[in-house]
Each structure stands twice: as structure tokens, then as C-alpha cells.
């Protein structure tokens, strides 16, 4: 790809595809904002209270319309923020342009950027000398710890959005290299129950359909992994008429999948049966040579985990006599036997490579968690030991309350009698 040179707009540095795309980006950011009432209320409060005044912040996220609303809220709160992409294929170039042109937020992200550019953008962001990091997959946090040790003393904390990133943070903590607090946004109830399940389920199928235009009814879809993302993907595939097989390594989750009505088997048994394969595990080489060898001619494989490692594309490429693009985000690998296997989105997140990511309504809660986690870190600066912290229950519940309010839904509350009963141990049979 051609790398766009770093440009300056009234001393604002940025690296995006085309700033003239800003009007389209603004329209779409505002449209997304209509479905994000919680982030809107947080932004309005931040604008008055300025909790991030004097704070330098890096946000490493998918550069989407929803992320834009988060970035705007953080800037309203006084943050000196820089935004970079957390995936080379997930950037929406018109959104990046709007954030630079209309909101003065430095963005370093181009859809389709190569790995060298992606990692250079991480370094540029770290040159901002952040106090707070919003991470999505852990790349910025890991790079800071490995290559920028002299900057660690300035870090108040980091927040992490993904299962993959939390796994990496736990490994950092185990190795004794995580020397500041990290907020586990991924495991907040108002995040994983909705973003991971309903968001991933809908957006993954959206990306697959946009990339291929295949009819899912009657197809056999193999979902690798039955965490919240896998549950959502399996549920939505079944809703579109697919016969769904689940593969798992966790016995409890496998039982859950069976009792939810899905067939469960090892990947080597599912491989000859599947028409479409979706990996949502967060692990490496879930689909590998022994699976490719027994797949049907024309089988489609894609990933909706975080990194492009779940499908062993290097091995598939070595087996292929020809690789050609047959549609946007759709590559056909022809093997020596004459059989073809179709890979979507270069094995990267199909929901962001070929579609627009999760719907705004679920990202509203996820990004509310990010914003309030950042505020929590600032309020508790110097009070938290290095480690991984869950989102406080009161913040989680407040986000849920605000979301219900935005949806026009009210719920019951405990009566004094019920509260007394729940706090008593003397009443029995």
C-alpha cells in the first residue's frame, strides 16, 4: 500500500487516508450518536466537570463511528487524546477524517495499512507520552512495557476492551512486568453480556454476508469457541436457518452448547461437514493444516476473534498453488488437489474488515465503561496497586440504569419489606 505522509493541520499532526472524506464521517458519527444515549450523558457531564484536564491519553481502538463518539466525549472532558487503530483493516476512513477536520483529534489510522505502518502508528502514539491508555487487544500496553520502560512512571493506568487483551494483561501480571493498574472493561456485565454476545453475533454475520452474499439457510456453520462471542455467533447463524456445530476445549461450555441445542464435536470431525467456519476463540491456529486437508471444496473460513492468528493462513498459503481475490475481502486459495478454500478478510476481524463492526446501541455501553473506567483511574491515581481490576459494580449498574432510561424502560425497586428480608437471617421455613 502507499503510505500517506504525516500531515499537519494548524500544528495538528495526523495520518489518515483523505481529509476530504470528513463530511461523510460526520453524518455517520452523528447517526451512531443517536443510538448512544449513555455516552452522550457522560459527555455532557464530562464537558462540565473536565475530569481529564491536563491528562494525555492514547486510545487504540477500531476507528469507527462509535469510537468517534467515545473520543469526542473524552476530549470534552479535557483529555489531550490521540487515536490509533487497533486493527489494520478496521478503520473507517471517513470517520478518521472527521475527527481530524471537525474535532481536532489527532488520528493515525488508514484502512488497509500494512503491519509496518500499524506498528509505526503505535510508536507515534507512545511519543505522545500518555498518562492513560485505552487498549483493544493490548498492543499499546505491551509495546510500552517492552520498548518504552522510561515512560511507565507517567502511566496512571490502562483500560482493556477485549478478551484477548485481558489474557495478555494476565500474562504480563504473572511475569511481573505489569507495573500499573489495568481496568478490565471486557468483563463488565454491561459489556460482555451485550457487546460480546449481541454485538459479535449480529456484526459477524453482517460481515460474512457483505463479503460473500451467501445464503446461510441450510448451510452447516462451524463456530469455534462458545464464549459470549461464540454464543452470539451461533445464535444468529441458527436464526438465519443454518445448521450449527460448535467446537470447544472447555467441557462446561461444551455442555452449555449441547443444552442450547447445538451439535458439539472436535474440529477434525467438524471440518469435513462445514460450509462456513467462524473462529471466536482468541487462540492460535484453531483451524490448521489437518483441518484444511479434509474440508469441502469451496469451504469458507473467517475469524471474529481479535488477531489474525486463529486460522493458520501461512500453512494454507504454502499448500496453495494459486491465491486470488474473488470479491472484496474474499480470497480463494486453490490447493494442489484442485480443491479451493475461501478466506474472508485476510483472517482478521470479519465484522470490521467487511462490515461496520458492532451496532451503536451495544457499543454505547462498552464505551461508557471505557470512559468511566478512565475517570475511575484518574480519581484513584496513586491509590491502586499494579494489577487487573474489574469495573466497580456501582459503575456497571449506573451504566445499565442510564441505558434503560435511554430506552424509555423503567423497572421495579425493592420495597422496604423486601430489603429487610434480604438483610435478615432469622426468617426461614
Swiss-Prot record:
Molecular function GO terms recorded: adenosylhomocysteinase activity
Pathway(s) it belongs to: Amino-acid biosynthesis; L-homocysteine biosynthesis; L-homocysteine from S-adenosyl-L-homocysteine: step 1/1
CDD domains recorded: SAHH (cd00401)
Residues binding substrate: 64, 136, 161, 191, 195
Catalytic activity: S-adenosyl-L-homocysteine + H2O = L-homocysteine + adenosine
Role description: May play a key role in the regulation of the intracellular concentration of adenosylhomocysteine.
Similarity field: Belongs to the adenosylhomocysteinase family.
Protein name (record): Adenosylhomocysteinase
Organism: Gloeothece citriformis (strain PCC 7424) (Cyanothece sp. (strain PCC 7424))
Amino acid at each position: 500500500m502507499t503510505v500517506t505522509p504525516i500531515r499537519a493541520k494548524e500544528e495538528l499532526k495526523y495520518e489518515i487516508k483523505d481529509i476530504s472524506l470528513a463530511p461523510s464521517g460526520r453524518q455517520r458519527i452523528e447517526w451512531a450518536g443517536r443510538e448512544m444515549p449513555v455516552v452522550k450523558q457522560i459527555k455532557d457531564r464530562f464537558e462540565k466537570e473536565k475530569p481529564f484536564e491536563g491528562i494525555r491519553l492514547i486510545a487504540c481502538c477500531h476507528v469507527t463511528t462509535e469510537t468517534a463518539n467515545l473520543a469526542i466525549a473524552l476530549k470534552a472532558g479535557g483529555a489531550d487524546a490521540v487515536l490509533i487503530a487497533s486493527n489494520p483493516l478496521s478503520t473507517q476512513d471517513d470517520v478518521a477524517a472527521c475527527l481530524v477536520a471537525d474535532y481536532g483529534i489527532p488520528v493515525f489510522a488508514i484502512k488497509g495499512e500494512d503491519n509496518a505502518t500499524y506498528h509505526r502508528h503505535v510508536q507515534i502514539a507512545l511519543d505522545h507520552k500518555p498518562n492513560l491508555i485505552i487498549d483493544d487487544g493490548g498492543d499499546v500496553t505491551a509495546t510500552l512495557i517492552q520498548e518504552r520502560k522510561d515512560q511507565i512512571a507517567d502511566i496512571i493506568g490502562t483500560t482493556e476492551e477485549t478478551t484477548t487483551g485481558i489474557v495478555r494483561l494476565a500474562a504480563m501480571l504473572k511475569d511481573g512486568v505489569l507495573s500499573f493498574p489495568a481496568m478490565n472493561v471486557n468483563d463488565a456485565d454491561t459489556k460482555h453480556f451485550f457487546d460480546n454476545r449481541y454485538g459479535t453475533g449480529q456484526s459477524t454475520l453482517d460481515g460474512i454476508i457483505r463479503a460473500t452474499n451467501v445464503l446461510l439457510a441450510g448451510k452447516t456453520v462451524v463456530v469455534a469457541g462458545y464464549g459470549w462471542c461464540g454464543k452470539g455467533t451461533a445464535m444468529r447463524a441458527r436464526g438465519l436457518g443454518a445448521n450449527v456445530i460448535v467446537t470447544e476445549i472447555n467441557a462446561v461450555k461444551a455442555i452449555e452448547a449441547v443444552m442450547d441445542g447445538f451439535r458439539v464435536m472436535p474440529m477434525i470431525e467438524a471440518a469435513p461437514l462445514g460450509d462456513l467456519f467462524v473462529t471466536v476463540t482468541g487462540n492460535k491456529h484453531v483451524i490448521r493444516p489437518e483441518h484444511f486437508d479434509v474440508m469441502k471444496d469451496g469451504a469458507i473460513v473467517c475469524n471474529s476473534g481479535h488477531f489474525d492468528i486463529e486460522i493458520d493462513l501461512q500453512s494454507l498459503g504454502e499448500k496453495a498453488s494459486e491465491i486470488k481475490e474473488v470479491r472484496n475481502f474474499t480470497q480463494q486459495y486453490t490447493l494442489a488437489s484442485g480443491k479451493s478454500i475461501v478466506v474472508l478478510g485476510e483472517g482478521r476481524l470479519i465484522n470490521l474488515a467487511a462490515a461496520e463492526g458492532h451496532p451503536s446501541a451495544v457499543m454505547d455501553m462498552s464505551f461508557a465503561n471505557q470512559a468511566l473506567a478512565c475517570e475511575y483511574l484518574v480519581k484513584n491515581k496513586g491509590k491502586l496497586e499494579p494489577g487487573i481490576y474489574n469495573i466497580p459494580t456501582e459503575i456497571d449498574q449506573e451504566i445499565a440504569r442510564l441505558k434503560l432510561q435511554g430506552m424509555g424502560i423503567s423497572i421495579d425497586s425493592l420495597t422496604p419489606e423486601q430489603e429487610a428480608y434480604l438483610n435478615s437471617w432469622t426468617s426461614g421455613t
